[in-house]
Amino acid sequence: MSAAGTTKGVTQFHLRHFILRASAEPAIMAKWANNLQELCESTRLGIPAIVASNPRNHVTTDASVGLSVGLTAFSKWPGELGLAAMRDFTLTRKFAETASAEWRAVGLRKGYMYMADLATEPRWGRVEGTFGEDADLASKMITEIVLGFQGNKLSNTSVAMTTKHFPGGGPQVDGQDSHFDWGKFAHYPGGMFDYHVKPFKAAIAAGTSAIMPYYSAPKGKGFEEVGFSYNKAMIGDLLQDKLGFHGIINSDTGPIEMMPWGVENISIPERYKKALNAGVDIFSGAADPTTLIEVVKSGLVSEERINQSVAKLLKEKFDLGLFENPYVNVDAAMKTVGNKEAVAAADLALRKSIVLLRNDDKRLPLAKKTKVYFETYFQSGRNAGGEAIKVSKPNYPGLEFVSTKEEADVVLLWLVPTSGGLFSSQGSKIDLNLSKNRIDVNHVNEVLNAKPTIVAINYTNPWVIEEIDKGKATSIIATFGTTKEALLDIVTGAYKPTGKMPFTTPVNQAAVEANKSDVPGYMEGPGYGLFAFGHGLSY
């Protein structure tokens, strides 16, 4: 994958599409965007730039380059799974409209988002970015997201969406991800290929500006076993001809040089030719266009074919109003990003996203004056020797927070399991037991046996909790990227839980390994699930 500084990209390589992965204060982002547009305006044709980003409005555990920016100055909403857990489509639209306004204020006019993939393979490392395992729910979420960010059509009040990853990245073999050679294949053992396409149909109906194919190659199904960016049957025949999508086909980052699955043995110029013939309009991660220009000059690809893609890219800019006025108001950006109304709406969503899974002893909600020992257990694995346990004593009305378990009437134990993030993968077997995801289950069981305990678990995958579910875990809460304040409002009843599970959690690792990767958990049959899709209690 090539890279170039912004000025060099504009003046030497004539680039006009950029992705901003950094997190900065709104004023800095707005000034940078204006400087970029001023540079573009000074060139021969004055074609404006369009700046894209991955999601940057979510509380997330495993934020990393290419997935999510993580916490920023923008309003902080639940993770995508949490948005789905709300089952509130009006608030979902509010989220999208709010985030769209924040993005536009700093000059971000294109989103590499959202994921229409379905979380049917519980081991997949990108489940956190999905709207769960159910195609109907994901379709409704994607519809509200696209309409909220873009409006009914692209305009100067839109952020253009790039719905991903066609035709659905969920059904990966053994849950391995196709960023890597050992995860290059998607498969459909349950025969549910069409199920995974359904949310993309919703995105198309809502008017998504672009669609991004995944790196994966289809295993079986009679399709050519090449990555979806090279796969004419998937892009040209299915997405464009059958589904009627005529917007931009935006490759994921680096399929030409880094993830050329199925075309490893052909030259880079031939890879460009194959991807263009399949239907790709723009290549992410290819900052230096020299090779692509040679592909055209040599006659491998016609200039007419390139012009078809250029027309789409220019039309998007025209529709967004960038040719009329690409600049933003720095003062307005500072007032818009993270404004009070946005924060209030996000705070409501953070509470609505929380799911009460179990309340067998009716311990919840906690009575006033309860003495609480509040411990968060999170070991990211990125800081060797870092302290996993953090004890919180927030100033929260009605409860008394204490420093030790011994002083407490009840323990609130918030577990944040993590595999270490998608890019920590080395191709080894994926195990969803808590002990394999940086949780000391001996410590958890000691706490459970010592004191009445409320266990909150942050789900970025459908974790297997068998190791701690031995009769003492009678109060369990699911979070999907939220805040301590929101969690405390749930446990006290200041906000009554309303969330519903966006996926099914497997009862044990054997169920995980026996699952059919393209089949949602609620269709796996008896004996698979512990907490079912749609499960959620209240007071």
Region annotations inferred by a language model:
Residues 105, 259-260, 265, 290-303, ...:
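C-terminal non-catalytic regions of proteins with extracellular/luminal or membrane-system context
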Residues 47-52, 215, 287-288, 308-309, ...:
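Short coil/turn segments at secondary-structure boundaries
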